Design a protein with these regions (language model features):
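Ribosome-associated RNA-binding proteins
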Residues: 1-185
């Protein structure tokens, strides 16, 4: 049994000039040129401090599990900062064989009309500050928060899933084909 003291992990993340960061009651607010976002760190066991132009994250323990949680928190903060600076873009392709699918954006929802000849539209929610644009056979989803953009894309893809048929034959749906950092204009 070792009595050697193991070093607690700590990282200092530099905040760019165009980004403002504040923390109150373990809720991290990040504001940048593309918008603002927030992340609740109340249930994540790390020590979080905002200094002038930097964020210091410190693990609370020395075990492997504590290190994994520490690296997850670091990744979350980096994702928030990158999102308000450059944003995220997901591109989806509308695929159909017989009935032409049309996608319309109404009241913060995505309406998929004429999917497999159905009369009622299938409706998916748009999460957060995400923007959705339907151009021809492509649907472009952009936004500053990665979780909102990816959840919008996932709910749209799941909503157009073909059920009770052979998925190798009936390929109709809306599928993700590209995702990258940055918002195209």
């Amino acid at each position: 049994m070792s009595t050697e003291q193991v070093e607690i992990h700590e990282v200092k993340i530099e905040v760019p000039d165009k980004v403002k960061v504040s923390e109150k009651h373990r809720i991290l607010n990040v504001e940048g040129p593309l918008g603002k976002t927030r992340k609740n760190f109340k249930k994540i066991p790390v020590d979080l401090k905002v200094e002038s132009k930097s964020i210091v994250i410190k693990s609370l323990g020395t075990r492997k599990k504590d290190y994994a949680i520490f690296k997850t928190a670091e990744s979350l903060v980096n994702t928030l900062i990158k999102g308000v600076q450059t944003g995220y873009t997901f591109k989806m392709k509308i695929v159909y064989a017989h009935f032409p699918i049309t996608v319309k954006i109404k009241d913060g929802n995505i309406h998929v009309e004429n999917f497999q000849g159905e009369r009622a539209p299938r409706v998916s929610k748009i999460f957060g500050d995400t923007k959705v644009v339907a151009k021809g056979d492509d649907v472009v989803i952009t936004g500053p928060v990665l979780t909102d953009v990816s959840q919008t894309a996932a709910s749209l893809q799941q909503n157009t899933k073909v059920k009770n048929k052979d998925s190798r034959v009936f390929l109709d749906g809306i599928y993700l084909f590209e995702k990258h950092d940055g918002i195209e204009k």
